[in-house]
């Protein structure tokens, strides 16, 4: 086999451990007592810097499992290494917050480490979806920390939407607002089964959020407690960016490579293997893992890297349910936000979307079109300033 050094990496996820202190019902990772050494973390960081283009900051994210378990062994010393050597790297961490305290929060903020915070809603949703080992309440641990988390980081309220909760999206959206969050994100768990009733509930809940947007975005300024629904705003931006394509019926479902899978972005597992995406790192550096593409010491395995790219560059994005694509209004935007790794893990094909994800995307576009139709002509509105079409 032959190898090549990566040239274009701009972001890297360090899967510093496969261990976790929660037992989430939908976790895609097989929890194992695997822990990255500091040496592997440092060597991965050096590889990322090999690809520095001399202009933009590189991005490095601590991921898991639960990365705060590696606070003393990796997060603190690697942050110090980056700081001591004045490396142009923007750090981030994805955490469930259970181990977060004031001292850690201050360290993260002082070192400009961004925080992605995973929480699924109020107590009944959080405790059902994301319990502690033994089924104990994780919400009771997190609730006293929420004010601190909002104050230090102003993070997105990032949740996973299970089927039973599809009729409660609005409830959790307002819960996040009342707790002081300014951004809310939710998406389906691609591994779960969603009934037609679940999906209809999801559409109805999105419509409620659409009305909330219309009521608030037609004003000349947003209220101080307004909470942005990130998926809808992403869809509105995509709608305006690709409106010409949409209105002309110019269909193109080939991937836009938005996530940088295996080219601009990659993931490193605990032993230094390189994967196209962090969601596939836990499956191990095995021959049958499509997303395993090399290691930090040798670089990309040329053939494996080429094979991965061919899977998502050469195939159109389609729905796993036959007959859905032809009449789908989202098909003109389908390449803009598709998750290849999830599709591969679930269907065995990189460009075959789970049906619930298709309904999710389509429902958001329907709401976006409704919001746009009502508000675009209101030239004094916040909406017109933020989302108006470019002529």
Model region roles, listed by residue range:
Residues 258-263:
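Short, small/polar residue-rich loop motifs at catalytic or cofactor-binding pockets
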Residues 69-184:
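Conserved AdoMet/S-adenosylmethionine-binding subsite of the radical SAM
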Residues 29-34, 128-136, 345:
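Short glycine-enriched, charge-decorated loop/helix-capping segments at active-site entrances
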Residues 1-106, 110-111:
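Conserved alpha-helical substructure of the radical SAM core
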Residues 205-246, 279-329:
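C-terminal accessory region of radical SAM enzymes
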Residues 55-61, 92, 140-240:
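Conserved C-terminal portion of the radical SAM core fold
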Residues 1-2, 271, 285, 317-391:
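Radical SAM enzyme core and accessory elements
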């Amino acid at each position: 086999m032959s190898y090549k050094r990566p040239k274009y990496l701009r972001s890297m996820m360090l899967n510093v451990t496969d261990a976790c202190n929660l037992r989430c019902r939908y976790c895609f990772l097989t929890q194992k007592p695997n822990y990255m050494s500091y040496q592997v973390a440092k060597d991965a960081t050096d590889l990322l810097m090999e690809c520095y283009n001399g202009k933009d900051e590189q991005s490095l994210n601590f991921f898991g499992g639960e990365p705060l378990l590696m606070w003393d062994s990796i997060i603190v010393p690697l942050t110090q290494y980056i700081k001591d050597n004045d490396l142009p790297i923007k750090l981030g961490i994805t955490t469930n917050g259970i181990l977060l305290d004031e001292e850690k929060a201050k360290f993260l903020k002082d070192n400009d480490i961004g925080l992605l915070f995973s929480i699924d809603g109020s107590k009944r949703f959080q405790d059902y979806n994301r319990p502690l080992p033994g089924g104990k309440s994780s919400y009771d641990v997190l609730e006293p920390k929420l004010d601190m988390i909002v104050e230090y980081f102003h993070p997105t309220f990032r949740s996973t939407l299970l089927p039973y909760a599809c009729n409660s999206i609005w409830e959790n959206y307002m819960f996040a607002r009342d707790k002081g969050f300014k951004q809310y994100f939710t998406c389906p768990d691609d591994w779960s089964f969603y009934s037609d009733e679940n999906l209809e509930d999801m559409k109805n809940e999105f419509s409620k959020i659409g009305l909330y947007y219309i009521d608030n975005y037609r004003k000349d300024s947003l209220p101080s407690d307004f909470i942005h629904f990130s998926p809808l705003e992403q869809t509105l931006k995509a709608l305006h960016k690709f409106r010409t394509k949409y209105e002309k019926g110019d269909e193109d479902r080939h991937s836009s490579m938005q996530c940088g899978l295996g080219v601009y972005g990659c993931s490193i597992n605990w032993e230094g293997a390189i994967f196209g995406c962090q969601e596939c790192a836990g499956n191990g550096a095995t021959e049958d893992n499509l997303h395993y593409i090399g290691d930090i010491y040798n670089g990309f395995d040329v053939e494996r890297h080429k094979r991965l790219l061919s899977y998502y560059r050469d195939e159109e994005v389609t729905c796993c349910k036959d007959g859905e694509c032809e009449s789908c209004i989202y098909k003109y935007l389908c390449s803009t936000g598709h998750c290849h790794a999830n599709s591969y893990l679930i269907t065995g094909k990189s460009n075959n979307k789970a049906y619930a994800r298709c309904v999710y995307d389509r429902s958001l576009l329907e709401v976006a079109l409704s919001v746009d139709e009502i508000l675009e002509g209101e030239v004094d509105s916040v909406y017109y300033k933020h989302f108006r079409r470019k002529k």
